[in-house]
Amino acid sequence: MGFLNFFKMSGPSEKKVPVEQQDKVYKSLRFQTFVAGTIGYSLYYVCRTGLNVVKGPIIQDGFLTATQLGAISSCLLYAYAAGKFVNGVLADRSNIKRFMAAGLSVSAFTNLVFGLTGLWSTGVGTASSLLVLLLCGLWTLNGWAQSMGTAPAVIGLSRWYPLSIRGTYYGFFSSSHNIGEGLSFVFCGALVGLMGWQWGFMGSALAGVLGVIIILLFMHDNPESKGLKQVELLTGEKTQEEIDAEAAAKAAAKASADAEAKEIQKSVFKNPGVWFLALASGFMYVARYAVNGWGVLVLEGKGFETTQATMIVSINAWCGIFGTVLSGFLSDKLFKGDRQLPALVAGILHVISLIIFLYGGDSVAINVLAMILRGLAIGVLICFLGGLMAVDIVPRKASGSALGIVGLVSYIFASTQDIVSGILIDKGTTVVDGVKHIDFTQVGYLWIGAAIISFILPLFNWKKRQKAL
């Protein structure tokens, strides 16, 4: 019970904040929670994507093959897909500070162990089958730990921010994975270039420790635990009488509401439009994680040094921020709430960027252009195909079920991509004078084909609209 109680949501504090100080204290603590969640999750992503930076040097060292790296990478995504659902449910009833810090601590530890294993391996040579299995287990643990990051940060916004401004702060938080991915490519890429691939993991572990410290210092579980009233009362959204009346009404209507919710959720699973979008998102995730995971290796194959290659790929992450922000503006203002046309345009742009990246040669300008276009396109597609378009065609009460289906399919496809891409890359690898050369033609067909399918499938939903429930 002691372990479970450690993660239990904090109860109200006996020490109350004086009325005249409540507004000032509340605004300070809620902003700290937002900053801690955003920075903390950005550093989660550094611990998640470090392996993407070092695949080329690992292959050249002969420590692991592309097939083995693909299998290890897929373990993280499979575990993340399963853990995201489970930990999302657990986080709702947890102390979000401790929950989020615990996940990042474990993730930092797995990166440290991977790096130390690499340092030890320099005197051993190629990894044995047993060591590969152990690394798969280690990265599975990392995937599960990574799934403990998103929910606490989002729940923090829900517990501390009123509905009237929550969306604005959620928009800023949504850029955290782009920030983390960009930091990973720049920071870890520099360490790899200076000190070797093992130190890329060391850098990720250090970033994780920094994130844990920030979360523990600045994230707060809920207003009540700090001697404040609940957020609805603090912000004037509701009176105590309204809160009590709603609680009583919910208790009285719980049985019928539960039955209705189950029927609505069943209808989502029978909705072919949701599955078209889930598959579309899955194929988009194939292309997304292909470049995120193997893009540095592609550029190294063109002759770029690791540090330069990681800098170029990081541009994709930074531009993704603008793509995400742009997606909402475009659909709401320019297209009057229509997601399908901008998603189609972004899908075509995504394919064009992949073709330029894979077959545009070794010009820095051309590859930078490809990453700019891809970042903008992926930012839009993650927002639309990754969930919003599915939410648009189901009853409001079934939004969570639709998002769950899309998310699960997306990560299953992304995980499988890592395995298949690794096998195809190994098949395209030749050794000339002791140096490995990789032909990306076959795997490039896979990535481009997936991107094409991802923008064709949503066309089957062109005239579908949300059911007003």
Summary of predicted features, one role per range:
Residues L51-K55, N271-V325, I382, G387, ...:
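Extracytoplasmic gate region of multi-pass secondary transporters
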Residues R93-L104, K333-G347:
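Cytoplasmic membrane-interface "Motif A"-like loop-to-helix N-cap segments
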Residues L138-I179:
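Cytoplasmic helix-loop-helix junction between adjacent transmembrane helices
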Residues S105-S128, I348-D362:
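C-terminal ends and interior cores of transmembrane alpha-helices
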Residues T49, L77-F85, E181-G182, A317-V325, ...:
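Residue-level signature of mid-helix packing/kink "hotspots" within the transmembrane helices
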Residues F173, H177-E224:
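Helix-loop-helix hairpin linking two adjacent transmembrane segments in secondary transporters
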Residues G337-L388:
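C-terminal transmembrane helical hairpin of 12-TM major facilitator-type secondary transporters
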Residues E14-K27, K226-F276:
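Juxtamembrane intracellular "pre-TM" segments in multi-pass secondary transporters
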